[in-house]
């Protein structure tokens, strides 16, 4: 076997090993990486329960809602700001309702007659 044939064989072997390594790794490349990197968030747990507040759940920053209504801007409701610091979004418990609010129309019934989205709440007949 000639010297150039041996070098060609080694080069082919190295290329095959690199290809095998590339195919067996679970690397994320520029186009398919999640925002925080491949180890950032497990896709099975994209949502978690929202924080609880004085008498219900946090439905947005400074908004606490429960069976007897909603509090906005109170000391207890201001605890809900902490929810925004968590990179994993929370899932508000309640029946879905639609608002006429541009860009953010899908909300949840959080109290009797009240529908909320991330930053606002309104009276909604579908939540009775």
From Swiss-Prot:
Key words of the record: Amidation, Disulfide bond, G-protein coupled receptor impairing toxin, Secreted, Signal, Toxin
Coiled-coil residue spans: none
Any Pfam family matching the protein: Hormone_5
GO cellular component: extracellular space; secretory granule
S-S pairs: 28-33, 50-90, 53-64, 58-80, 65-70, 97-115, 109-127, 116-121
InterPro entries xref list: Neurhyp_horm, Neurhyp_horm_dom_sf, Neurohypophysial_hormone_CS
Signal peptide: 1-27
Superkingdom, taxonomy of origin: Eukaryota
Residues annotated as transmembrane: none
SUPFAM superfamilies in the record: Neurophysin II
Propeptide residues per the UniProt entry: 37-44
Presence of the UniProt keyword Signal in the record: yes
UniProt comment concerning the protein's domains: The cysteine framework of the conopressin is C-C.
Main location: secreted
Glycine amide: residues bearing it: 36
Protein name in UniProt: Conopressin-conophysin
Organism of this sequence: Conus geographus (Geography cone)
Subcellular location: Secreted
